[in-house]
Amino acid sequence: MESVCMCVELHLPYHLKWYWPADGYRRPEISSYFDQERIFTDFQHMAASISRTNKVLTRSIENGAAYTLNLSGTFLDQCSWDPRVLNSFRDLADTGNVAFAASTYYHSLSALYPDLTDFKEQVWTHMEKISELFGVVPSTFVNPELLTSGNIGGVLKKLGLTCMIAEGARNLLNTDMPVSVFSDDIPTLLRHIDLSEDISKRFSDKSWDDHPLTADKFASWIEHIEGDVITLYLDYGSIPWNESKAGGMFQFLKDLPLSLEERGISMIRPEDAIKRFEKVKLDTLKTESAARYGMEGLLGNHAQHFYLKQLEIIVQELAARTDLSENGEMKKIVGYLQQSDIFLDMNTANITGYEKAVNNLSILSDFRRAIWEGRT
């Protein structure tokens, strides 16, 4: 193996309320539909661990690591509650070996709409926000849930993006391994599922045969895999969580670049990988859809499909109402209603999946009526 790309995602959703329709319809406000107390509590909990975690990532970078950060727009909105959080990420950016990925601003599935206008606007908004906050222009794109759908490559290239990261799903790879820069419309790195989850999910599992996982052990596994680049994709929250559960995660990240370097393996950013390695054509990137943990988690039942279709209609209806579409509160509401987390909550594999579907569709109905009536 020649190299490793490591991308870390930090997304905190705007949770929907359990919604009980009052007499008539409500005035469309964020507080009407979203559980602000829970959102703030979750942010405070994450914020408490960010400074320490980012100091660990800084030490890792000093030892030769490179990271790509995917900070969702919903998380960046919440950072207004504590400017120290953004300053911590600015300090990380100042190390010079951190890239920031672009995504849909509201962590949405807008890439699945037949009309990609809203998708394009959300990606551009996210790119502008990253540039404003950190002084860098993203070149790598990551769809929420590592979603890939074959019609977005052209849009991404027009926005100036040069590559993307997606799920290393079996229906994309067939018999191939996710160890190359793949290409169809746009160069694509595919997440190595097993190695990513060895870090994010199994690291603190004391019943796991490979516990404890050291950097040296992990690097030795990578050394014996043939290929150009392995892409690791982690949830940011898994880093402090694993450290608190069993310890060792912080030391693992500090040591990993050194252990890889001893074996002649470098940690690089996606934009470096696409320049260094020959692209391997993968036709399924244009013909198949895939997402982290499977498309069925997002769109596996009627309620999820219906919610997506209603969103598509609402986005178009709001855009057509210039008197409403320029209202900042309305724009944020329709954005937050598109979060991928809402679809995952309606998965009937969850014990509350049916209840969530009824709840979420009720909120959507209330908001759509507000557009019809011109209520703000």
Which positions does each model-derived feature cover?
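N-terminal catalytic cores of secreted or lumenal carbohydrate-active enzymes
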Residues: M1-T104
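Active-site and substrate-binding clefts of carbohydrate-active enzymes
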Residues: E2-A48, P178-I186, L190-R191, D205, ...
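An acidic- and aromatic-residue-enriched active-site/binding cleft used to recognize and process polar
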Residues: V8-P13, S72-T74, S103-S108, N143-S149, ...
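A structural motif corresponding to the C-terminal end of an alpha-helix
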Residues: M46-Y67, D91-N97, K129-V136, H224-I225, ...
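Alpha-helical scaffolding within the catalytic cores
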Residues: R52-K55, S80-A93, L172-S183, L213-W221
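Generic structural signal for well-ordered alpha-helices
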Residues: T53-L57, L86-R90, K120-I130, G153, ...
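Metal-dependent polysaccharide deacetylase catalytic core of the NodB/CE4 family, i.e.
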Residues: Y67, G73-E145, P187-R202, Y236, ...
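Catalytic domains of cell-wall/extracellular-matrix polysaccharide-remodeling enzymes
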Residues: D115, E121-D176, I239-L256
